[in-house]
Amino acid sequence: MPVKLAAGGRVKQNLTITPETQLLDEVTIVSTGVSRIKRSAFNAVAVDTKELQNTTKNLSDALTKAPGMKLREAGGVGSDMQLMLDGFSGKHVKVFIDGVPQEGVGSSFGLNNIPVSFADRIEVYKGVVPVGFGTDAIGGVINIVTGKKPRRWFLDASYSYGSFNTHKSYVNLGQTFKNGFTYEINAFQNYSDNDYHVDAPVKNFETGSFNESEKYRVKRFNDTYHNEAVVAKAGLVDKSWADRLMFGFTYSHMYKEIQTGVRQKTVFGEKHRRGHALMPSMEYSKRNLMTKGLDLVLTANYNRNATTNVDTARYEYNWRGEKHPLNSPGEQSHQYSRANSDNWNGTLTLNYRIDKAQTLTFNHVLNTFRRDNTSLLAAQEQKDPIAKETRKNISGLSYRLMPSERWNFSAFGKYYRQYVAGPIAETETSSNFIRTSRTVDSWGYGAAGTYFLLPGLQAKLSYEKAYRLPTIEEMFGDEDLESGDVGIRPENSDNLNLNLSYSKALGKHSIYVEGGVVYRNTKDYIQRNIQDLSGGKEGATYINYGKVLTKGYTVSARYGLGRWLSAGGNFTQMNVRDNEKTQIGTGGATENIGYKSRVPNVPYRFADFDVNLYWHDLGKKGNVLSVTYDNQYMHSFSYYSQAVGKNSDFIVPDQFSHNLALSYSLNRGRYSFSLECRNFTDEDLYDNFSLQKAGRAFYGKVRIHFGD
C-alpha cells in the first residue's frame, strides 16, 4: 500500500515477508524453489511451468522438459501413460503433489489429465530420493508444487478447443482475508473423441482372414474420453499456532472408451470404463513448534475410488467398425464389474535445525489400501469373498551439514515394511482361491553431497541402496487387461549419480550446461510381460525378472539472450541390460540366452530441443508476443529381446516430431490467446509398439488472469 509523506515528515512502516518453505531434507531457505533444487546435493531439476501456462499442455507434457524424462502414451487424450526416467518407467517413478504421495487416486486425476496451470513448478528427483518424501521409488520422484503463498484474491480461467473435437477448460480462484481465512478452488475438464486416423490390419469377417502385415488407413471409433475434477481447499494461514491449516476435498470423474488391447491389432467396439473418486484431505504446518528450529508438517487423506469395467458386447469388431456376432458375449473377457478401492494415506515430517549448519529430518508415511470386486452380471450383485489389501509403512531419518554456501552433505537411512493379503489359487491348475498374507521389510540408506568447484561450477555425487515395494497393480492387476501376482517380491537397487553443471551470465547473455552419469544395479526387477490368452486375445502380467544393469548419461544446455530469446535442449542415452546369467525353469537352472542384451520395450536414446522468441510491448506496453518451436526425437527400439532375433515387425521405428506455438498476451498477462500445431509434419508416432498416436493436430486457447 502506498504511504503519503509530507515534506520533512517521518513515518514508521512495519513490513512482513512471508518466505516459501519446503520441509524435506533441506534447510529451510528463503529462495525460489527452482534455485533451491539446483543448489541441493541431490540429482534433481525443477521445471518452471509459468512459460507453459498459455499453452494447451498438461503436466505430463511439461515433464518432457526435464533431462532423462520420456513420456510414453498409448494414444490420445486420456490414454494410458507411463513416465520413464533414466531408463526406469511406470511404477519405478513415484508422483507427489506438494510432497503428498498420489498412490491410489485413480486415473481420473492423472498427470496427463491435469492442466499445466495447476502447478507453479515440477520437481524431478532422479534415482536417489530425499527422506522427506517417504517413498520406495528406485527410479525417482516427481513432485508437483502448487502455489501456497497467500494471495489477496485471484482468478485464472482458460478454455481450449482443437482437433478430434478436443475441449479443455480450467478455472482456479481463491482469496485470503485479513483474519487469515483462505480458500482456493481448482476445477478442470477434458473431452476428446480421439477419432484420429491410424494404420492397422483389418479382419475380413466374410473369409475370416487377418493379415497383420497388410495395413489400412482407418479411423478410431471407440475412443471417446472425458474427465472432470474439482479440488477445493479452505483453512487458516499465518496464525500463532499454525502457519497453515487447510482442509480439502477432491472429486473427479472419468469415462473412457477402450479402442484397443495391449496391441493395435486387437480392436474393441463397445468396451468401456467409468469411474469416480472422492478424497477429503488435511494439511497442517508449523515452524518453530514449541522450540526454535523445530518444524512440523502433517498431511492426511482418504481416497474412495470406484471403477466400473463394462465388456458385455455380443459382437466382434474390426478396424472399419464392422461387426460380427460372437459365440459368447465379451470382446476381451465377459465382465460387468465394479472395483471399490479405499486408500488411506498419512505423512509426518519433523525438521530440526540444530544450528545454522546442521539439520535433522524425520519422516514417516503410512499407506493402507483395500479393494473389493463386485460382479454386476447376475440379477443379484456377487461380491468376491476375498478382498485385496496392503499396508505400507516407510520411515526415514536424515542428517544434513551445510557449513557454507559452497558445499553441503546429507546422509540418510530408511525402513520399509509392507503387509499384503489377497487371493491365491490353491494349485497352479485350480480355479479355487484361498486367502494368503505375508509381510516383508527392508532397510535402505544413502548419502548425497555437492561442492562448488568455482563460482557457477557445481559438482554433485549421490548414492542410495533403494527398495521399491510392489504396487497394487503388480500384485492384484487392474481387474481388466492386466493380472497381478500377490507373491511378487520387492525390487532393490544400488543407485549412483554424478553430475556437473555450469552457469554463467555475461551482460544480456546467459548459458547453462549440465551433464550427468547414472548407474543402477537392480535385483528382482519387476517386468510387465505380454501374454497370449484364449481366442487370440492378449493381456499383461508382472514377474520378477531378475537382475538389470543400467548405465547412461544425460546432457542438457540452455542459452538466453536478454528478454527475447531462450533456446535449449536435452539428450539422453541409457544402456539398460539384462544382467541375469542363469534362469530358473522347471528343469532347473539354465544359461540365460538374453544375458547382456538390452531390456526390451525400453527407449534408450532420445532428445528434445526448443526455441522461444519474445517481442515485448508489441502493440502496447505490457503486451508480449511469443513464438515457440520444439521437437522430440526417439531412436528405434525393439519390442522383444534382441536375444530372440531382430524381427523388424517388432521394432518401434525412429521418430522425429515437430511442434509450433504462437501466443499473444495483453495487459501484462491479463488476457492471452494462443494457437498451436502439434506434429506439424504429420509423422507416424509411437511410444509403445503398434499403438499409434495422433498425426497433425491444431489447437487454440484463450486465458484470463486477474488479481495478485
Language model feature labels by segment:
Residues 151, 160, 177-263:
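Periplasmic-side early beta-strands and strand-to-turn transitions of outer-membrane beta-barrels
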Residues 44, 60-101:
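Extracytoplasmic beta-strand/coil segments of soluble accessory domains associated
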Residues 231-254, 273-429, 434-458, 462-464, ...:
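Face-selective signature of the C-terminal outer-membrane beta-barrel domain
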Residues 512-521, 541-638:
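Gram-negative outer-membrane beta-barrel transporters
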Residues 100-127:
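Short acidic/polar hinge/loop motifs at secondary-structure boundaries
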Residues 452, 459-464, 468, 491-551, ...:
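Membrane-embedded beta-barrel scaffold of Gram-negative outer-membrane proteins
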Residues 6-53, 60:
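Short, acidic, small-residue-rich periplasmic hinge/interaction motif at the N-terminus
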